[in-house]
């Protein structure tokens, strides 16, 4: 099982400790070879007060499934995309397998890059302060996106309100997500293709659209969101279900 347990991409949920322990119970009862893969990409990416979550490894140890668990995270969304430093936790055969695969990919870590990160952050508080500055940049853009999405009639669909991460999910009430994306493109706004968050890019309901408000400037975001809500209204009015 592969999942993003905090600010889950794209809908933003934070898995509760109770649900995580239940996942561990169900998976381990199914098979002692069942593997839990956690992509903790948004571990420290809160931009609003968020639910507390115990460390995943602590929960895995409590459930007795540390040999079946792999927890990974990186600084790709903290410092440089694809150029940060990364971390993982595992145990037993799972750890042995990761070490074997990793050894065939790279001789050793980029120690200069590790040194750069240590010099920049200094300590854990330095990381927290840096992510607070991230939040101050990200939060206003989400607020802009919400202000436009709130203009849409509820019959058109609904949207998520994450407290961290980088994405908003808009779910159309009719199977028109692909049409919305097409209309946006025709009006000069490119957004993530409909279905991108599903296996093989197939959304059986054709309803889920992922919005990433952080990439563009506030000014461009306002234009893009005006285009988006117009596209949703047009697509919704074109089809009767």
Residues covered by each model-derived region:
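A structure-centric feature marking long, well-folded core domains of fungal metabolic enzymes
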Residues: 1, 9-13, 65, 117, ...
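Active-site phosphate-binding strand-loop segment of PLP-dependent enzymes
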Residues: 1-51, 239
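Generic structural signal for small/hydrophobic residues in well-ordered secondary structure
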Residues: 1-2, 72, 86, 117, ...
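Short, conserved active-site loop motifs that form the nucleotide-linked donor/cofactor pocket
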Residues: 34, 69, 157, 189
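Conserved core segment of the aminotransferase class I/II
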Residues: 61-139
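Conserved glycine-rich beta-strand-loop-beta hairpin in the small C-terminal domain of fold type I
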Residues: 118, 132-146, 156-171, 185
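Helix N-cap motif at beta-to-alpha junctions
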Residues: 173-177, 216-218
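PLP-dependent enzyme catalytic core of the Aspartate aminotransferase-like
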Residues: 186, 200-241
